Amino acid sequence: MKIYSWGSGNLGQLGIGNTDDSVSTPTLVLPPDGKKDYEIVNDIVGGGCHSMMIIDNGDLYTFGSNDSGQLGINSNEQQQQQQQQQQQQQQQQQQQQQQQQYQTIPTILNYFKINSIKIKNCSGGWAHSLACDNNGNIYSWGSNSHGQLGIDTTCSLNSTLSTSNNKNNNNNNNNNNNNNNNNNNNNNNNNNNNNNSGGVIKKKIVLKKKKVERKNLNEPKLIEILFNNKIRIVSVSCGMRHSIALSSENDVYGWGCNKFGQLSNLIDGNSLKSNNNNNNINDIADPMVQDSPKLINFKNEIKIIQISCGFQHTLLLDINFKNVLSFGQNKFGQLGNGNFIDQSNPCVIDISSFILPTSTSKSLNDIKIKEIQCGWSNSCLLTNQDKLYICGRGEYGILGDNRDLSLDNSNSNQFKLLNSESFNENKIKNFSIGSEHILIQVYSNDNNNNNNNNNNIYSFGWNEHYQLGLCEPIIIGKDGDNKSFPQLLPSIKGNDKSLVKAGGGNSFFILP
């Protein structure tokens, strides 16, 4: 099995051993053990500037940026790897500082290996990571700036009352150069206070805002509240700074940033029992943040089968594969509900509102959604007819509607069919949306496999870092040209088991 990557690699997130900012040609990602090929790779996912790869035996590899600990490799392991990688003392000293911030090759996450934990699926946010093991336990690590790890890492929480005689006292403390003027003002104010209150100086109460400081984690840690409540998780998804998990009971749990309603307004604060009496203290300090997992309570009216997080929005698919629920930021219409208003109340979108039956379907009842995915500001649905529908941001050409990008940057607040001649005689086998670009592998309708387009790979959208893989010559200082229409990748072709995977500003291809 071979792995290819291309696009942005300035922090090693391509896994090809360097920090090239732009790679336009699909390049082999060599196994870290020196072997020629990988045995079996189950999945590759991309975060903001880091990547994660799951091997068939359950091992997890990470590479790319580690500025917040999102690779899950602690400092001792890093130092050992740095010493092995460097041959000269001067190079070693330089690289020790750099390698603490990134890894350029896939590096096994020893925490799971040592503890015999087998990883089933994973997801990367802007600077945090989640992984789910075969037993339904979730582990998190990296940035916890907005509670996105689901673990209380608070190291200080200050809430005090202070008093001052008048508003000039604060100025006295802050402006040493104006002490004389402030003292005169203080005297005048004190005289006024004495005249107005019979000689009693009134004290002004100043409430200092609660300050919550959360530590990052540079090593995976079990989210105990889910484990203690015997919640078995089957899949996870990371947004920029929020996290969503799906349980084996088809319930959804969310935590982290909720500024735009990306956790919804159905968060049930009493859904999980905690051994920590102060479990909700941070949630009270900042209502925009949920530090621990909470049930998104649909009151048994809706059960969910798939989850996906965008940058600041969330998409869910119901267990009947018929309805999509969306909530969170909607600045670009990424919720697909017909407007551009942020929504904390989940919008239920019936596919009958935008999907029409084709000659292969007798009625609308035959059509179902088999996969949902979110980009940063877009949402995608793939139907059982192998048709792709996209909504959200129109800039960079990610809607694939062949618009003139110099004239039209309009957004779409409704799901629209990706209509391309490339797909008229072919169906979409698999697809992946990254931050602002999409990769698609097609297969032929020709049962005899006489179609030369079978297993071709296409890409469109944002191409600043040449993540579309079109093999263009790279000119230093010049960005790649964005594409609003599916482009054929000239250097690679898939097979019946290959997969495309899009990351933040990069792309991967798994070729068995």
From Swiss-Prot:
Q: Which UniProt keywords apply?
A: Repeat
**RCC1 repeat start and end residues:** 1-56, 58-134, 135-185, 197-248, 249-319, 321-384, 386-443, 454-512
- One Pfam family of this chain: RCC1_2
Q: Which InterPro entries match?
A: RCC1/BLIP-II (IPR009091), Reg_chr_condens (IPR000408), Ub_ligase/GEF_domain (IPR051210)
Q: Does the keyword Repeat apply?
A: yes
Ranges for region Disordered: 66-85, 162-200
Q: Where is the composition biased (Low complexity)?
A: 162-196
Composition bias type Polar residues, residue spans:
66-77
User: Which domain of life does the protein's organism represent?
Assistant: Eukaryota
Q: What SUPFAM superfamilies has UniProt attached to this entry?
A: beta-sandwich domain of Sec23/24 (SSF81995), RCC1/BLIP-II (SSF50985)
In its keyword annotation, does this UniProt entry include Repeat? yes
Name of the molecule in the record: RCC1 domain-containing protein DDB_G0279253
